[in-house]
Amino acid sequence: MRDSDIMIVVGALLGAAILATGEETGREWKMRHSSSPDRVHFTVESYKGTEHWIFNQDVPLSYFRGLSLDTLDHSGSAHFEYVRDAGRLLCKGAFSWSRGSGSFTFVPNPGFPAELAKLGYDAPNENQLFSLLMHDVSLEFARGVHDAGLNASTNQLEELRIHGVTLDYIRETQRAGYRQFRAKDYVDIKIHGVPGEFLRNLKEAGYDLSAQQVIELRIHGVDSEFMDDLKQAGYELSPAQITELKIHGVDSRFIRDLKSYGLQPKASDLVQFKIHGVSPEFLRELKDAGYGGLSESQITELKIHGVSTEFVRQAVDLGYHFSPQDLTELHIHGVDAGYLRRLRDSGMRNLDAQQIAKLKMHGVD
């Protein structure tokens, strides 16, 4: 059962609560063709007053007795059964113009609760049985969850099915090395769209994470490509550090560009660079100008004050070797490469940054 196919208006588990009331509850079914030739679109509704529960999905024809596509395509009365491990829906009504509707009666499977109990689950009551039937909780599924060691309750079996957790997904996750996950963990990681490949890549990268840590990475857009790029660039980071990088916009392209320029700033520096708009190109050009050994604070200070790499390179070409602080101070006072060139050409050489700044401040041009 795919969770995208299930619409729950007041919550799947609330459906059981609605049925549990002593008041009369309406139960109706509707049917039409599906886009798949071996399925029909089957809707089951249960309602009372303003409370409304609806099950809505494409269902294999094999789940029905006494129903065929030919029956659906011909007008007339409808009598068929929807049969699953937890029980049956006895449906009656009418078909017309390839659509059908009517009412149903739920008939529980009396042996199903006992079989669940043998596996260690709480025996469901009739209302729970109806909900288990609608979410297709089979004995095979219950047995697989039990054998996987998830320690699930009867209600959690239903939650697993609602959110699309399959036995194949559980097996794939456990093969990837996550044998500590329990039923709630599987529901949570499935809600956040964590694929088995991502879990496997985390393990291969040496990360042994809890479900919540995995989810935190996923929420902030960390994918396998980003993890691999970090690893290839030589970064061994904690999940919290990786998350922080993503939060501040450090992406795979940024990491790859740094690597292509032969640069590997510290992880904390990466965050500051992103915050202040320091690009890999800016770092490379500083390095090419002879400023490859600057600290993160020195680099960000240059960027904050608008010191361009062109000015840095031109100053070097003119024979100046200013400190990062000098470059910032000169830029603040409006000193550009043209001013430095005019000083040199006028014979004023071997001046330090403070002297040049004072000349500029006093209007010597």
Question: What is each PLM-predicted segment?
Answer:
Residues 2-5, 18-365:
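General marker for long, soluble alpha-helical cores
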Residues 10-17:
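Bacterial N-terminal signal peptides
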